[in-house]
């Protein structure tokens, strides 16, 4: 078999392959012999059809099958021989497939980039440390209470944090507009749910009162037909209800699946969850900085096939997340290209770090991660057992642990600055990660 390779771009290869005619004809003859044993031809018993008839009737189909099989087989033989690592299926251009002649074709494909991960010393990481203080715990308990607020009707003027039940009709230039009217809407004043000025205009209103509120839609309002326009809302207040926070008692604790009858026990469980959240937040921020540093220090070209595959995966995820009412291909690829490129580049870099440093998942750490996740459930032992009975889920955890080992490896070589901060600052969401160049 003759093989020649042309580098058309940094990653694209144009490989010409010639399969000897002898091999082609041998495969064609083999197919015809197989066909002869099972072919049904009028006037002949099965297995007794003359080869001349078999060739006349079936040789064309046999050659097409052989062409497809030999193209696939010889392509993979050639990439192994040439020590190439294809990043996707090739585009095939037939050149010659005549009887008695060599099978010749061109395969055009991309290869994975070859590189060594470098620049570890140029990476700067700020590693946060924090504790869950009693004040943080108190604040969290108040958040949990507010999340379970109920409202009771009152006969007084509405104030911020009250819930009002309203009917309203909105008009622009004296004309009602689509989406500008509703009946029986529940609205918590001060929640910021409505456009600026709407909720403020209801502060001080009582049940049965009608108010006219003038507002202006923001310039960046999602409905461009309304953006920047002045509107008048006629609003009828049907009822006013005041917020009532639940007491910290056994019934409240049970809503969170916590079998504790004492406030001390509940606080201990909440603190445990907050500490778990804190550890994960700190770990995530360190990881994001490491990954950003690796991206900046190792600009690499991405195979188009990998980028397209990742874009398609993100499209499918987006459709599933938002209800699946559209087809993935209806979403513009441009929406996902930046995120897809970051994922692909980081995937290549992380895989290369694993290879360079001969990393393997630490099974003790895998167990620790599973137990940490399981501790959030009521029956943690069952959750741990479930992971170890499901190879796919277990391998996903191993991948997470391996990625953490990559981060630890980089941290040993990077410049790391430790910083003590408050719990609130530590768990605050980080800025969006940098895109791959």
From Swiss-Prot:
GO terms for biological process: 'de novo' cotranslational protein folding; cell division; chaperone-mediated protein folding; protein transport; protein unfolding. Its EC number is 5.2.1.8. Gene3D superfamilies: 3.10.50.40, Trigger factor ribosome-binding domain (3.30.70.1050), Trigger factor, C-terminal domain (1.10.3120.10). It is an enzyme of class 5 (isomerase). GO terms for molecular function: peptidyl-prolyl cis-trans isomerase activity; protein folding chaperone; ribosome binding. PANTHER family: TRIGGER FACTOR CHAPERONE AND PEPTIDYL-PROLYL CIS/TRANS ISOMERASE, TRIGGER FACTOR-LIKE PROTEIN TIG, CHLOROPLASTIC. NCBIfam families: tig. Belongs to the FKBP-type PPIase family. Tig subfamily. HAMAP family: Trigger_factor_Tig. This is Trigger factor. It comes from Pseudomonas entomophila (strain L48). The lineage of its organism: Bacteria, Pseudomonadati, Pseudomonadota, Gammaproteobacteria, Pseudomonadales. The gene is tig.
